[in-house]
């Protein structure tokens, strides 16, 4: 692998601008070589002056890059030292409390079943668990910084070697010895010491001396391109998707036959539509995950997933394919129910019952950790006023807004099975009299309207909670106003529908109010999508017209197509309200998957915007703490900032003299004297063809 590709694959995306600009240096060298005057037509002195001038510019650029790398490394190292001191304080406090407790006298006792513990023991158990997670995230940040150190040194060595080869000189090697090999980012070995001390602390204080268990907890996922999925996972993805395609073709022919013999199949459509939307959502989320990884958007950090164990796009395709097969088989069974001994109403119940069981299955099988994460996130979403709202919380609530049809169809299914289904018949899901008006299709008692408002309500109260936490009216209250327009839209749609059925004279008034709030809501959400969620139409966009200054995805056409798509689908309701009710139901069924697709496109650019925010803050790992930063920690941080090897003022002298000793006056743990050195090796080849 060429080093440029290796560098691109192994950098930390949030620190991309802080790495050596290897490609820019290569272009600089090749451009100088191409533009150099020929010895055949120019005297030798002119050629020498040309290359001397170029080398002066080249080494000045190298100095700027080296200063940038030194400064960034010093900042991140000071941050790591502060973080390690804080974690040591938190761990020492937990150990002190544990020693004072008569109920818990050793760390081993915290492993007994949680439901046998007292309240104090539960809190202590949770603190130790949080500390383990915090140390594992901190260890990951250290490995990333060590990786940054090694990649940049290798980059300088490679580019200076290439310089010497192209210009047929040794000044590049001399410059490396004089400047790079004495630079703080390379000579400072404090990062190795922190890695060793972290391993020792986790081994001796949190894992009772079991180094193998400690290193398993601290294991760092491969730094670089996505690792290939297990062969069996890929096999299952191909198998499930192939079967799903075949069953879909069969389903189309069966549906045509069913429509020819029985044209009143609307209940089947309503009952099975939600399942299809869920499967479509999972499949498109798999494509989202693949696209984010390919573009370098760190969705694992954004969603605060466990970097050591999370679902890849192959796993999402596998789940979507498996559920898709069950959905097809269940619907086919309904079509052929008249020749079956099993009543038709059993099949939908079996399908959705299995889906619910798959999600809440308490056994540690079928992606247990991911399912538990989703259930916990759903709980946080539905109890939003009582929790601090994170990105994953409002992202999931946003997805529910595009999946509101699933909630409405669930309400319809419950109503249908409760009031319209003839349980003593097995011919079909429809009432005996097709001409009988459907009770569950109406806005009876406002239940459908309330269900339709639930997703918007969840986002609304999340915005209020974020305002309570931050006291920032913009954007949180303004965003809450956006979701409040949904309440008016749904309310007037319900009033229009009920008054129209009863032939009231004020029906037209509610219709115009409905259309008015639809326009307000669509314009509001469209502007918010493009400007706030996606960060587009930035006045400093430069050459990225109507976009933003920095874009992640390679083609600008992606952004322009997404803008057009968002405008069209945000105003697609115009088609739905301009036609008859019967055809309107069909159009609504067509638009529901399109709304899921719109959300799929939205996901790409919303996470890109969040990723760029993380890049601006150089945030590459989760910051997990048991306790907030106290006064002592703040004082230590300020002292560290004032030290020579702490975070230095960028405007002051950037001398390469570096004092590697920093005194951290913290309670020493027993494990600190047993630290062992660990190093991450960076692939390095001296073959010039690979540079």
From Swiss-Prot:
Extracellular side of membrane: 260-264, 338-343, 423-429, 504-506, 582
One cellular component term from this protein's GO annotations in UniProt: plasma membrane
Catalyses which reaction(s): phosphate(in) = phosphate(out)
PROSITE patterns per UniProt: EXS (PS51380), SPX (PS51382)
Membrane-spanning segments: 229-259, 265-296, 310-337, 344-365, 389-422, 430-471, 473-503, 507-534, 554-581, 583-621
Keyword Oxidoreductase recorded: no
Residues bearing PTM Phosphoserine: 663
Region (Disordered): 667-691
SPX domain: residues covered: 2-224
Any GO BP: intracellular phosphate ion homeostasis
Compartment(s): Cell membrane
EXS domain mapped to chain residues: 439-638
Gating residue for phosphate transport (site feature) positions: 573
Function: Inorganic ion transporter that mediates phosphate ion export across plasma membrane. Plays a major role in phosphate homeostasis, preventing intracellular phosphate accumulation and possible calcium phosphate precipitation, ultimately preserving calcium signaling. Binds inositol hexakisphosphate (Ins6P) and similar inositol polyphosphates, such as 5-diphospho-inositol pentakisphosphate (5-InsP7), which are important intracellular signaling molecules involved in regulation of phosphate flux.
Protein name: Solute carrier family 53 member 1
Natural source organism: Mus musculus castaneus
Organism lineage string: Eukaryota, Metazoa, Chordata, Craniata, Vertebrata
């Amino acid at each position: 692998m060429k080093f440029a590709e290796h560098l691109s694959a192994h950098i930390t995306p949030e620190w991309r601008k802080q790495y050596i600009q290897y490609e820019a240096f290569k272009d600089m060298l090749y451009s100088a070589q191409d533009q150099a005057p020929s010895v055949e037509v120019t005297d030798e002195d002119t050629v020498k002056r040309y290359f001397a001038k170029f080398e002066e510019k080249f080494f000045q650029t190298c100095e700027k890059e080296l200063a940038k790398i030194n400064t960034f490394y010093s900042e991140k190292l000071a941050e790591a030292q502060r973080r390690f001191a804080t974690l040591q304080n938190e761990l020492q406090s937990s150990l002190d409390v544990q020693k004072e407790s008569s109920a818990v006298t050793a760390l081993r006792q915290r492993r007994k079943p949680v439901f046998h513990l007292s309240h104090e023991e539960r809190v202590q158990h949770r603190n130790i668990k949080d500390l383990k997670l915090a140390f594992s995230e901190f260890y990951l940040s250290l490995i990333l910084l060590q990786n940054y150190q090694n990649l940049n040194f290798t980059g300088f060595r490679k580019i200076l070697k290439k310089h010497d080869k192209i210009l047929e000189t040794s000044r590049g090697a001399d410059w490396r010895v004089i400047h790079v090999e004495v630079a703080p980012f390379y000579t400072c070995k404090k990062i190795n010491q922190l890695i060793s001390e972290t391993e020792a602390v986790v081994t001796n204080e949190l894992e009772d001396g079991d180094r193998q268990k400690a290193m398993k907890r601290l294991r760092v996922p491969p730094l670089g391109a996505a690792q290939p999925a297990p062969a069996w996972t890929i096999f299952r993805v191909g198998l499930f998707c192939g079967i799903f395609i075949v069953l879909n073709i069969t389903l189309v022919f069966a549906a045509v036959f069913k429509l020819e013999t029985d044209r009143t199949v609307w209940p089947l459509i309503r009952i099975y539509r939600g399942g299809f939307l869920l499967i479509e959502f999972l499949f498109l989320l798999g494509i989202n995950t693949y696209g984010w990884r390919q573009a370098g958007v760190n969705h694992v950090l954004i969603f605060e997933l466990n970097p050591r164990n999370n679902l890849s796009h192959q796993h999402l395709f596998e789940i979507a394919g498996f559920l898709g097969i069950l959905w097809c088989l269940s619907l086919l069974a309904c079509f052929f129910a008249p020749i079956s001994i099993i009543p038709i109403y059993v099949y939908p119940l079996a399908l959705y019952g299995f889906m619910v069981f798959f999600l809440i299955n308490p056994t540690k099988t079928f992606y247990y950790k991911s399912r538990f994460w989703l259930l916990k996130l759903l709980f946080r979403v539905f109890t939003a006023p009582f929790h601090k709202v994170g990105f994953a919380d409002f992202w999931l609530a946003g997805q529910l807004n595009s999946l509101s049809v699933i909630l409405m169809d669930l309400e319809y299914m419950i109503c249908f099975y409760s009031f319209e289904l003839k349980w003593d018949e097995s011919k079909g899901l429809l009432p005996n009299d097709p001409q009988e008006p459907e009770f569950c299709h109406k806005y009876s008692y406002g239940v459908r309207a309330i269900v339709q408002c639930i997703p918007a309500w969840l986002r609304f109260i999340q915005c209020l909670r974020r305002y309570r936490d931050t006291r920032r009216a913009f954007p949180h209250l303004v965003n809450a106003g956006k979701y409040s327009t949904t309440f008016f839209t749904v309310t007037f749609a319900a009033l229009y529908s009920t008054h129209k059925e009863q032939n009231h004279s004020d029906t037209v008034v509610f219709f115009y109010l409905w259309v008015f709030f639809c326009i307000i809501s669509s314009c509001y959400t469209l502007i918010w999508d493009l400007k706030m969620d996606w960060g587009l139409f930035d006045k400093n966009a430069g050459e990225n017209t109507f976009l933003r200054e920095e874009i992640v995805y390679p083609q600008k056409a992606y952004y322009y197509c997404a803008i057009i798509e968002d405008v069209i689908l945000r105003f697609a309701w115009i088609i739905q309200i301009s036609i008859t009710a019967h055809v309107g139901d069909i159009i609504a069924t067509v638009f529901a998957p399109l709304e899921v697709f719109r959300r799929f496109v939205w996901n790409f650019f919303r996470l890109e915007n969040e990723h760029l925010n993380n890049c601006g803050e150089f945030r590459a790992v989760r910051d997990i703490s048991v306790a907030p930063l106290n006064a002592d920690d703040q004082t230590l941080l300020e002292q560290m900032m004032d030290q020579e090897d702490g975070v230095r003022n960028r405007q002051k002298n950037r001398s390469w003299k570096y004092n590697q000793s920093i005194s951290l006056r913290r309670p020493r743990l027993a494990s600190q004297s047993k630290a062992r050195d660990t190093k991450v090796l960076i692939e390095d080849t001296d073959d010039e063809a690979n540079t």
